[in-house]
């Protein structure tokens, strides 16, 4: 693929339609319990002891930031929209949580030395927090 190949890109949506789609995604309903579930997942990455995840205290150097919560809300709404729903379900969270958090949780050097997988860390968090 060369730079010349960009000349053949066809426009499939205009700005007005894109803005309408963004508004539709923003209007996807997310239940308060699911919002709390997402907040707990993010918080558990920063404060594992508060969630009885003592084994992760020395493994997680930096948990996901509060900004990750906002991005997770956006991602689950987008996923619900792409699945044809006008509401977020626990399935939407399950489908995107690892992809959303994988680069936001920084493992400690100890964890890296032990070759601990970030997906396993996220899974441990998910297993401790009840799905609404």
Language model segments and positions:
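C-terminal engagement/docking regions of AAA+ P-loop ATPases
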Residues: 47-132
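Conserved C-terminal "switch" segment of AAA+ ATPases
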Residues: 1-55, 82-86, 90, 111-113, ...
